[in-house]
Design a protein with these regions (language model features):
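Glycine-rich, hydrophobic membrane-spanning regions of integral membrane proteins that mediate transport
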Residues: 2-347, 351, 355
Length: 356
């Protein structure tokens, strides 16, 4: 009650419609306004790219795209197996050397790599999986996915199942009774078996698919190209023609080159501007520490992705799609959008005072 009385007494003396600005003089308000404008100007200057920053980003994107076009190329089936650009052929050769065919064949036939999700046709299934064959079983079985396999594949090994998304987009998880002896009861043994199976499959003629490639079997829509194919059919055709995990690794190199050029150039520029070396190392994308880096990477990967889109358009060949490049573009686009819409506004939580 005393608090209410005091408030009423204060309102009777001062009034009830006081504004914060009323406690400042006109000169102080003007000074505050100028200070806020200066802070906003300095803030924008810190985050604004200069000509050198833009040039670094553009060059990095162009170099990465050039490596993709000239050295990665498009895989094609030749007399000696899959062939593409110089870099792709080099990477594939290194995989073949690291995983020799005779050793991988022995591993594939050993119990340590036998998994329940490796059926190559429908003879041992209880629920039919459309498209299951020696050509497509690794694309359809999620246990063969280089990412999902560590979850779905390990689960299948522990439960004696095979989990698939078939060619028509139907999700099927079924117990493989004929492969009951391939189960493991220990999660570590299951993980070891999963890795052994990956190893045995990686250099086969129809090898491991690119990460998450099997999920595209769900995309039963679209009318693309001369044959009016769905997205799923396009991806299935890409896998058949050699768009596999090894090619994914080859395509990742131009993306890494773009990334490295931007980050190293950014660090050199920061050091030349007088920043400490430890403050210039561009590992973090924290905009408080490196205010321009994320934007530079976004521009670089946007440029490289635009060039790749042009490559796909002019060749009319989906095999020209650089999957890792589009993943990088999506990642940095999300970060840039989040920065522009949410984080930037929260950092600039300074508004000019209302003048009366």
């Amino acid at each position: 009650a005393s608090d209410v009385y005091k408030r009423q007494e204060a309102e009777s003396v001062v009034g009830g419609s006081c504004e914060l600005e009323s406690i400042f003089t006109e000169a102080e308000l003007k000074s505050n306004e100028l200070a806020i404008q200066q802070l906003n100007k300095e803030y924008n200057q810190i985050h604004k790219l200069d000509k050198t920053d833009i040039a670094i980003s553009a060059i990095a994107g162009i170099v990465g795209a050039a490596v993709d076009i000239l050295m990665v190329g498009i895989p094609q089936k030749g007399p000696e197996g899959l062939e593409a650009g110089t870099l792709s052929n080099f990477i594939r050769k290194k995989f073949d050397e690291a995983f020799p065919a005779d050793e991988m064949e022995k591993l594939a036939n050993s119990k340590e790599s036998k998994v329940p999700f490796d059926a190559q046709d429908n003879r041992n299934t209880t629920i039919r999986v459309e498209g299951l064959s020696a050509y497509y079983h690794r694309l359809l079985s999620l246990g063969h996915d280089p990412l999902l396999g560590f979850v779905v594949g390990v689960f299948d090994i522990l439960t004696g199942r095979m989990t698939t998304i078939d060619k028509t987009g139907k999700f099927v998880s079924q117990v493989m009774e004929n492969y009951a002896d391939r189960k493991e009861s220990n999660i570590f043994a299951a993980l070891a078996k999963q890795l052994a199976h990956f190893k045995s499959d990686i250099t086969t003629s129809m090898g491991l698919p690119a990460p998450l490639m099997g999920v595209f079997n769900l995309f039963q829509f679209g009318s693309i190209g001369e044959y009016e194919q769905t997205v799923a059919e396009i991806v299935q055709g890409m896998y058949y023609e050699g768009y596999d995990f090894i090619h994914f690794c080859s395509m990742s190199i131009p993306v890494m080159i773009t990334e490295v050029i931007v980050r190293i150039s950014y660090a050199i520029k920061r050091i030349n501007e007088g920043k400490r070396i430890c403050d210039s190392i561009p590992f973090s994308l924290n905009r408080e520490k490196h205010p321009k880096l994320a934007t530079m990477l976004f521009i670089a990967h946007s440029g490289a992705t635009a060039i790749n889109a042009g490559k796909v358009y002019f060749t009319k060949n989906p095999m020209a799609i650089n999957y890792p490049q589009w993943v990088a573009f999506a990642k940095y686009s999300y970060k840039q959008l989040k920065w522009g819409v949410v984080e930037k506004l929260s950092l600039i939580h300074i508004s000019e005072p209302t003048r009366h």
